[in-house]
């Protein structure tokens, strides 16, 4: 007779292989951080946006693991604010034309200021050897393909009255993954619109029957889904 103790189901579900991307952020800390970021942005008339952005990116990195290693966002708002003011001025003097370059540059700044958290060595394996000459995180996406993909995603969402949002989101996530490299390895995204569609309908239904309360859980779950459908090639 087998006398080994039964293992809890939860432990089985939480087991993550070293090759996985994992995200463990929850709704409470997400909305707490988001509220603070919104207050900073609103009360500074947008000038404090870099500080708000850093708050959100630090929260996301703190809850993200790649191949067992925890991420860390190493940028400061002061490192972005000069560029942010410059981009705003260039957008004004070009009558909005320069704005097409702002979002891809912010995305690049966010990705290239990520690193693996060296203080978590007790839980995280050491970085792979032989890659010290390769930037840990690199992004090479440009404005043309960013806005082309964004326009297609927008049209897909609008012409389906929002029902095809999961397919639009997947378009954008695949584009981002295609242009992101970690220690020289390209990120791949294997999520599909159909794979998210069922969850999306369920979340909308739960939001409806809870009179909007469930909506607080949707964004963190979208982030988790987006992160955990990535891998390194």
Regions found by a protein language model. Name each.
Residues 2-36, 52-85, 102-152, 168-201, ...:
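Membrane-interface extramembranous regions at the lipid-water interface
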